[in-house]
Swiss-Prot record:
Keyword Zinc among UniProt keywords: yes
Xref: NCBIfam families: NactlManKinNanK, PRK05082.1
Binding residue positions for ATP: 5-12, 132-139
UniProt cross-references to Pfam families, sorted A to Z: ROK (PF00480)
Binding annotation for Zn(2+): H156, C166, C168, C173
Keyword annotations from UniProtKB, A to Z: ATP-binding, Carbohydrate metabolism, Kinase, Metal-binding, Nucleotide-binding, Transferase, Zinc
The protein, known as: N-acetylmannosamine kinase
Subunit and interaction comment: Homodimer.
Length: 291
């Protein structure tokens, strides 16, 4: 059976057909509409899936935000242009006439990355560092979603009580500092207004402020990982997302994690499925993989 998998992120929407063998084909992308109106996201999803839906038997959606009863509830509305709520499953079933499921994108990615691990691993955590910071936790071989869908939203744990206000309403969240949006928001002077991609480019060219911003992000993530190790005693942490997979970033995180006491060290791995982990994880869950 073929699954039409959809990944809704803060920057882009992706869709692909995924067979029972896990092979991805006909992958497509569109920019995520920066709009508070549900109609804008519905129209973008319609354009994304219409060329693919005739070739699928079901739909699996991985989306940023809390997924509860098939709907998206934005914990940080800024990541979706201010959109607060969207009925994912209902909308995709209306658009495609196919049975649909929805799950948080980082939770889905965690499940895909867990399947790719070698060795006797039962406990792992996936972290995505992109427009925002999200996560997924596998404990005892089971994916944790939580009764309200909040499990794994580690980007909204405290990093700095005197830090910037996060879009979720808290002050000093990891996401407000370490994410691509957080990196860009802290830029000053000639870097003010630059996006994270530009800041990474400038850092590679030797720009001191750009390098400091990226180090600040990596140091914040390393401290988060130490906290995660203390909380879950996971066997490894897998890092993905556009920032997490940027050249040289994971090495910085490893450097800062090494400065923590040894009890909080844990193996760090780059995401095996790169930017397709959310799509694949959603498809796996739609195929009936047990949580």
């Amino acid at each position: 059976m073929t699954t039409l998998a959809i990944d809704i992120g803060g920057t882009k929407l992706a869709a692909a057909l995924i067979g029972a063998d896990g092979q991805i084909r006909d992958r497509r992308e569109l920019p995520t509409p920066a709009s508070q109106t549900p109609e804008a996201l519905r129209d973008a999803l319609s354009a994304l899936v219409s060329p693919l839906q005739a070739h699928a038997q079901r739909v699996a959606i991985a989306s940023t935000g809390i997924i509860r009863d098939g709907s998206l509830l934005a914990l940080n509305p800024h990541n979706l242009g201010g959109l607060l709520h969207f009925p994912l499953v209902k909308t995709l079933e209306q658009l495609t006439n196919l049975p649909s499921i929805a799950i948080n994108d980082a939770q889905a990615a965690a499940w895909a990355e867990y399947q790719a691990l070698e060795g006797d691993i039962t406990d792992m955590v996936f972290i995505t560092v992109s427009t925002g910071v999200g996560g997924g936790v596998v404990s005892g071989g089971k994916l944790l979603t939580g009764p309200g869908g909040l499990a794994g939203h580690i980007g909204h744990t405290l990093a700095d009580p005197h830090g910037p206000v996060c879009g979720c309403g808290r002050t000093g969240c990891v996401e407000a500092i370490a994410s691509g949006r957080g990196i860009a928001a802290a830029a000053q002077g000639e870097l003010a207004g630059a996006d994270a991609r530009t800041i990474f480019t400038r850092a590679g060219q030797g720009d001191e402020q750009a390098q400091q911003l990226i180090h600040r992000s990596a140091r914040t993530l390393a401290r988060l990982i130490a906290d995660i190790k203390a909380t879950t005693d996971c066997q490894c942490v897998v890092v993905g997302g556009s920032v997490g997979l940027a050249e040289g970033y994971l090495a910085l995180v490893e450097m800062y994690l090494a400065q923590e006491p040894a009890a909080f060290h844990v193996d760090l791995l780059a995401a095996h499925y790169r930017h397709d982990a959310g799509l694949l994880g959603a498809a796996l869950l739609a195929q009936g993989e047990k949580l």
